[in-house]
Amino acid sequence: MNELLLNVVDPLHQWFLGLGDGGVLLWTVLKILLIAVPVIVTVAFYVVWERKLIGWMHVRHGPMYVGMGIFQAFADVFKLLFKEILQPSSSHKAMFIIAPLLTLAPAFAAWSVVPFDAKLVLSNANVGLLYLLAMTSLGVYGIILAGWASNSKYAFLGAMRSAAQVVSYEIAMGFALVGVMIASGSVNLSQIVFAQAGSSGFFDWFLIPLFPLFIVYWVSGVAETNRAPFDVVEGESEIVAGHMVEYSGGAFALFFLAEYANMILVSFLISIFFLGGWLSPIQGWVTADVSPWVNWLWTGGWPWLLMKVFFFASAYIWFRASFPRYRYDQIMRLGWKVFIPLTIVWIAVTALMVFYGVIQKGV
């Protein structure tokens, strides 16, 4: 599969480069589309899956039986695209439109360094982890701008909540990734996956020695994306839709798309940093060469990565259907008084485990 893609992509890349500056621009646009189109399609089916899963949990007839629950999500898309974008008369017109774009752009840009396989990555940057930290922290600026430009007290309150929440949990996520960097010895995402390779399968993954950091990163990822039970930014019972309260139509859809794209991105990153990425959990247990179509079961590949991502993406929905919303002060207390001290302690523990050879870097 990878060889087939490379045989197609490399000649195509050379052909575009032969066209001069215009070809370079077209190639850049093509790479942007290679990120945007799959993400948009994935979000569409993710919304369908969310409706189905919550429908099963809550025994809702619409998502379960009416048209097999497929048409509701697509009806929402058409409804949002064809609705008028209404702007409050007291809002800042330009900033009101720029805000959703500023939220969506980092959500798409972060995907450029995410590896799907050993060779299937758009940009195998040596500083991929630092780039991800930068991109994932930029989205909050769009939320703050939306709250300010709307000139609404509810929108502004939601934006301020989001700023405090993202800053709080960004620190915990960053400290959790410091442990990953120490254990892998790299900030390249592909090298982080290779550091978890070995003959013991999932026992070589960072999930076991870095389990507290895994929990911190997972929960912080849920808080970072403002999802239940950390959705005080859009608390319907308190501030309606938060920073999006004045948005409608396509502008609201951009916020919606950015949120779900970030949810899927966090699911990918958890799988890459702690669960071996595309590596098989039984890698090294079986060495027999049966057939190319069966070998991926123990040699690894993008299907394994997608299965791990599917689990964490479904967990987002499970949290939404099961847990009540935390109070704002509880969210802040969890981030500052529990997660940050825990990550600092476990960074030291990780350094000791690497020093004494408890954590062995992969092949």
From Swiss-Prot:
GO BP annotations listed: aerobic respiration
Catalytic activity: a quinone + NADH + 5 H(+)(in) = a quinol + NAD(+) + 4 H(+)(out)
A single Gene Ontology CC term: plasma membrane
Keyword Signal carried by entry: no
Membrane-topology descriptor: Multi-pass membrane protein
EC number, UniProt record: 7.1.1.-
Domain of life, source organism: Bacteria
Family label: Belongs to the complex I subunit 1 family.
HAMAP family reported for this sequence: NDH1_NuoH
Subunit comment: NDH-1 is composed of 14 different subunits. Subunits NuoA, H, J, K, L, M, N constitute the membrane sector of the complex.
Protein's UniProt name: NADH-quinone oxidoreductase subunit H
Gene source species: Xanthomonas campestris pv. campestris (strain B100)
Gene name as annotated: nuoH
